[in-house]
């Protein structure tokens, strides 16, 4: 029973870490990367659709991203979605391809991005701690109903803490790597 609770908690924490990783990859660093725009939602046929489902995205050099839609009719919708996003990029539409010039980040914008990374990282850690709390509550209920012993509860809580610490360390590393990337000029 405890193993099931631990496995369920581990899956939830891994999912939370994946979401954090995706969100951090979408934060602009002054260097072009398709991940910067691929998850921006575009209103296409009445359905919000990620850009990477509508077009090929390439980063031919460190300062440019090109977006080539498979259906040219969605060019203006992609352009509008990019302008609405909080990336601060101005799309250049030539009728076939959208080009995005990635200007170097100002020091002020760099600091804003670092704060955004820290905030997102803290939210993720809170989510992981909530998963831990829920799992502990489940184990305490089992102990209270005499389905597991106090020793099992102690062992389970120790294992749960190790799992939580491991995932929080991974999240911290993702955040630190992104901050380092943002600080590079």
Swiss-Prot record:
Annotated GO CC locations: cytoplasm
Intracellular or extracellular location(s): Cytoplasm
Domain of life: Bacteria
Any single Pfam family the record assigns to this protein: RRF
InterPro entries (UniProt xref): Ribosome_recyc_fac (IPR002661), Ribosome_recyc_fac_dom (IPR023584), RRF_sf (IPR036191)
Gene Ontology BP terms: translational termination
Keyword entries, A-Z: Cytoplasm, Protein biosynthesis
GO-annotated molecular function: ribosomal large subunit binding
Role noted for this protein: Responsible for the release of ribosomes from messenger RNA at the termination of protein biosynthesis. May increase the efficiency of translation by recycling ribosomes from one round of translation to another.
Protein family according to the UniProt entry: Belongs to the RRF family.
PANTHER family per the UniProt record, alphabetical: MITOCHONDRIAL RIBOSOME RECYCLING FACTOR PSEUDO 1, RIBOSOME RECYCLING FACTOR
Protein name: Ribosome-recycling factor
Organism, as annotated: Dehalococcoides mccartyi (strain ATCC BAA-2266 / KCTC 15142 / 195)
Taxonomic placement: Bacteria, Bacillati, Chloroflexota, Dehalococcoidia, Dehalococcoidales
């Amino acid at each position: 029973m405890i193993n099931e609770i631990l496995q369920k908690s581990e899956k939830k924490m891994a999912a939370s870490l994946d979401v954090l990783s995706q969100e951090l990859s979408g934060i602009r660093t002054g260097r072009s990367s398709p991940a910067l725009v691929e998850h921006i939602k575009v209103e296409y046929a009445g359905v919000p659709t990620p850009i990477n489902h509508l077009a090929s995205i390439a980063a031919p050099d460190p300062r440019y991203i090109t977006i080539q839609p498979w259906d040219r009719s969605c060019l203006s919708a992609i352009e509008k979605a990019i302008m609405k996003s909080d990336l601060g990029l101005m799309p250049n539409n030539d009728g076939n391809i959208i080009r995005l010039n990635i200007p170097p980040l100002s020091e002020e914008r760099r600091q804003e991005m670092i704060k955004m990374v820290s905030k997102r990282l803290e939210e993720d850690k809170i989510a992981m701690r909530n998963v831990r709390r829920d799992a502990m509550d489940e184990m305490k209920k089992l102990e209270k109903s005499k389905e597991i012993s106090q020793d099992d509860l102690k062992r389970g809580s120790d294992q749960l803490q190790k799992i939580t610490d491991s995932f929080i360390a991974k999240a911290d590393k993702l955040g630190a790597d992104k901050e380092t990337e943002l600080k590079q000029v």
